[in-house]
């Protein structure tokens, strides 16, 4: 009579031999294809070359591992996931931003030249890249509204799009602030709004290093994300 251990061993070996790896779970490529389709769906009416897919088939993780890995990444670690193309686009965007600020109007008929300190320029660039990292089209899908706070009012300065041919997937509102030490100059600028001065630029004004960014996804009903820096 066979022992209990022999029967258990025979049953286990026959069970394991009848099971195939393919039946346990789908191949990793199926997850990559599904992720790619999801990314392309978010950029409807765009060619596939216009978007960075959300393909994770080459990441070395399965769906569950990918999700748990991304959940565990802290915000500073996103610098390690930077995209060279997005970094190049961000540099161009910062140049457009400075050009727009050089002709800003703050309630006056004459444009003021608003200057961004180097620290502010660097911080804004990093924040925009961080907010764009999870978007299907990256920074190319951003529509950037630029505003400047002046006391209790907020003036719209410009609306920038890196790729006008691309349907925006998310909107960023950048709220800059004037340096509080410049209030006497600002008041003088506003008081000259109705004066008959020779057309041209008013005096230059420096912006504060503090700013706020509001993110709104245009393909989702998620709540607004407000980042204070």
Swiss-Prot record:
Residues 9-18 have a biased composition (Low complexity). GO terms for molecular function: 14-3-3 protein binding. It is found in: Mitochondrion; Cytoplasm, Cytosol. The modification Phosphoserine is found at residues 16, 118. Phosphorylated by GSK3B; this promotes proteasomal degradation. The keyword Transcription regulation does not apply. Keywords: Antiviral defense, Apoptosis, Cytoplasm, Mitochondrion, Phosphoprotein, Ubl conjugation. The modification Phosphothreonine is found at residue 20. Residues 1-68 are annotated as: Disordered. One of its GO terms (cellular component) is cytosol. Transmembrane segments: none annotated. Induction: Strongly up-regulated by hypoxia. Up-regulated by dexamethasone in skeletal muscles. Up-regulated in various cellular models of Parkinson disease (at protein level). Monomer. Interacts with BTRC. Identified in a complex with CUL4A, DDB1 and BTRC. Interacts with TXNIP; this inhibits the proteasomal degradation of DDIT4. Belongs to the DDIT4 family. This is DNA damage-inducible transcript 4 protein. It comes from Rattus norvegicus (Rat).
């Amino acid at each position: 009579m066979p022992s209990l251990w022999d029967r258990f061993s025979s049953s286990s070996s026959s069970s394991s031999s009848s099971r195939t790896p393919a039946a346990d779970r789908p191949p990793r490529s199926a997850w990559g294809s599904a992720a790619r389709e999801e990314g392309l769906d978010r950029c409807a009416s765009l060619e596939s070359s216009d978007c960075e897919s959300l393909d994770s088939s080459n990441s070395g993780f399965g769906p569950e591992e990918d999700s748990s890995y991304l959940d565990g990444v802290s915000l500073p670690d996103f610098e390690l996931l930077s995209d060279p193309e997005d970094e190049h686009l961000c540099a161009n965007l910062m140049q457009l931003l400075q050009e727009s600020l050089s002709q800003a109007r703050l309630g006056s008929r004459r444009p003021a030249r608003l200057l961004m300190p180097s620290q502010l320029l660097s911080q804004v660039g990093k924040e925009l890249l961080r907010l764009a990292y999870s978007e299907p089209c990256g920074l190319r899908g951003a529509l950037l509204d630029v505003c400047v706070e002046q006391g209790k009012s907020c003036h719209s300065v410009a609306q920038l799009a890196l790729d006008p041919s691309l349907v925006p997937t998310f909107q960023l509102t950048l709220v800059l602030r004037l340096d509080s030490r410049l209030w006497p100059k600002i008041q003088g600028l506003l008081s000259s709004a109705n004066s008959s001065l020779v057309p041209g630029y008013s005096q230059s004004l420096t912006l504060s290093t503090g700013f706020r960014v509001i993110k709104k996804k245009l393909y989702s009903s998620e709540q607004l994300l407000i980042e204070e820096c």
